[in-house]
A protein has these predicted regions:
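Membrane-embedded alpha-helical segments of integral membrane proteins
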Residues: 1-47
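Short hydrophobic alpha-helical membrane-anchoring segments
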Residues: 16-21, 44, 70-79, 244
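Membrane-interface helix-boundary motifs at transmembrane edges
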Residues: 24, 46-59
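Transmembrane helix-loop junctions in multipass membrane proteins, especially transporters and channels
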Residues: 25, 79-83, 247-248
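Juxtamembrane membrane-interface segments at transmembrane alpha-helix termini
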Residues: 42-50, 101, 176
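Internal/C-terminal transmembrane anchor helices
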Residues: 55-77
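A structural signal for short, hydrophobic/glycine-enriched beta-strand patches
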Residues: 73-234
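A transmembrane-helix-recognition feature enriched in membrane-embedded lipid enzymes
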Residues: 229-248
């Protein structure tokens, strides 16, 4: 039965990769499913020879078991960490950047913007910080794309603060902090900031926000597109551990 599961998973992972590639043109990090899928299929083909190398096979099982335990625990934290606090009022709403398709918000960015709009339209006194610089293949900054989208959907431009220098989540928080403190003329630790990002990204954002001096934060997260969930949450596993170890 276990052998059948290994083969089935290998086939499913491989099909999933090609599904994303054909239907959506591929998404970042989806290649891992192709690699793992092929490895599982190859293992199924050569499993008898692999099992003959008893020491190697035993060590391999231990390594895989440890990795799976860490993976499951980490994913559980990512999945179940609180993601929405609409009731909590904040003076500033910070939207974390995502990729731009030339000048148009990507699916992920649009999800964050639509989520932000829900909050902004019922909280007239809240300012919004759009955070994100210009990435590879992007004709305008992520901040500009977000600002244009918000204005198009009825948000007064005077409520919008642009942060257009950041290139990653750590810098989103670092540079937005300067913008918020400059605008409010107050220390960030004295302000309530609500952060808008995507569901898989909340836990890591909380860690990075805290490291950058955001003491009073809450979240209002958009939902990931169902087709992208396996890739997004797998990618976030590695990104979270990178943040825990390196992003200071």
């Amino acid at each position: 039965m276990l052998n059948s599961i290994t083969l089935i998973l290998g086939i499913i992972f491989t099909i999933y990769y090609f599904y994303l590639k054909i239907v959506f043109g591929g998404i970042s990090f989806s290649e891992i499913f192709l690699v793992v899928g092929i490895v599982l299929i190859i293992y199924q083909i050569f499993k008898k020879k692999i099992k003959e190398k008893k020491v190697f096979y035993r060590v391999l099982k231990i390594i895989i078991s440890i990795f799976l335990i860490v993976f499951v625990v980490t994913e559980s934290l990512i999945i179940f960490y609180p993601k929405n606090s609409l009731e909590s009022k904040s003076g500033y709403l910070l939207i974390l950047g995502a990729s731009v398709k030339k000048t148009t918000p990507s699916t992920t960015m649009k999800g964050r913007l639509d989520t932000a709009l829900k909050y902004l339209k019922i909280n007239d006194n809240c300012y919004v910080v759009v955070s994100g610089g210009k990435g590879s293949g992007e004709k305008i900054t992520e901040a500009k794309a977000m600002k244009d989208y918000l204005i198009k959907n009825g948000i007064d431009k005077n409520r919008i603060i642009e942060e257009d220098k950041s290139t990653n989540t750590y810098e989103n928080f670092k540079y937005s902090k300067l913008k918020i403190e400059e605008h409010s003329q107050r220390k960030l630790s004295d302000l309530k900031v609500k952060i808008v990002t995507t569901d898989f990204h909340v836990l890591r954002s909380k860690i990075l926000a805290y490291r950058n001096g955001y003491k009073n934060t809450s979240f209002y997260a958009s939902k990931s597109k169902l087709s992208f969930v396996p890739t997004y949450y797998t990618r976030e596993f590695f990104a979270l551990w990178k943040t825990i170890i390196f992003d200071r």
